[in-house]
Amino acid sequence: NYVGHIEQNEDRSITFPSGQKPLIKTHGKNKPNSPAIYIIRDGRSTIVSLWEFYGRKISISDIIEGNHKFGKWNEHINSWDPLNRQDTLLLKYEDILSDLETTLGELSYFLNKGIVCDKLPSRESIADNDGRWVRKKTDWKDALSGENLDRFNTLNKAYLKQFGYL
């Protein structure tokens, strides 16, 4: 299964396959003392992706200000502190797409596991498998401008620079 989402049981518990170590994807805040792979994405792209996730029913300005269940982009980074958190591999989303070979090498080393696949599945194959997680691609430059872009950059300038997005 390509999609990393886990469905909860009615009692909010999660059933994992027997004999496998769970890999849990979260958009939530940090839970210390567990190994983690933190994937950072350009916050401007993240804002637009979240806007699409919400079906454009919440304003971009509310997403920037954290007026939704995930909070502000910079608060999430603050919570995880991926550059200083122990036992954490920091990956850039954009690097995964542009240099998969290097990314797989880093993952293999961090997880102490061999590489079993060296290709990303296509968007189409993921959509065929579970289309609810594949949305229209919208470039942040097409959706985020003016006052909203200025506000986001003001709130997040330090992280945008630190991670090479400005």
Regions found by a protein language model. Give the residues of each.
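Short acidic/His-enriched helical or mixed secondary-structure segments at domain edges of catalytic enzymes
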Residues: 121-139
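Phosphate-binding beta-loop-alpha motif at adenosine-nucleotide cofactor sites
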Residues: 84-110
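Short, surface-exposed acidic
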Residues: 112-123
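Short, solvent-exposed polar/charged micro-motifs at secondary-structure junctions
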Residues: 32-36, 100-103, 127-130
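PAPS-dependent sulfotransferase catalytic domain
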Residues: 1-91, 134-166
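Residue-level signal for secondary-structure boundary sites
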Residues: 46-47, 99, 116
